[in-house]
Amino acid sequence: MVELDGKFATKADLKRVEDKVDVLFELQKTQGEQIKVQGKQIEQLTETVQKQGEQIKELQVQVKAQGEEIKEIKVEQKAQGQTLQLILKALEGINKRLDNLESK
């Protein structure tokens, strides 16, 4: 680029400068568009992560509820096992009485 007293030496020099400015302008425009697209992608990813976070929280609540149900079932099973033991003892007692009656 040749500039003499604030003026370009030739129209060709001016054209080269204008072409460079046009290229830079287009580059900035393209980069600006890319930044907008990337910004939208980041927003979408953020929304997705937030939704997944909510889903995880819901699953944690479900898992906690299932854990409570399992505890209740274990308590019921233990109680049923104790009841069965009592029934078995009662049956053993009845069997002994029957055996005693039969042996007499």
From Swiss-Prot:
Disulfide bonds: none annotated. It comes from the Bacteria. InterPro entries: DUF16. Coiled coil: none annotated. Pfam families: DUF16. SUPFAM superfamilies: MPN010-like (SSF144266). Belongs to the UPF0134 family. This is UPF0134 protein MPN_104. The lineage of its organism: Bacteria, Bacillati, Mycoplasmatota, Mycoplasmoidales, Mycoplasmoidaceae.
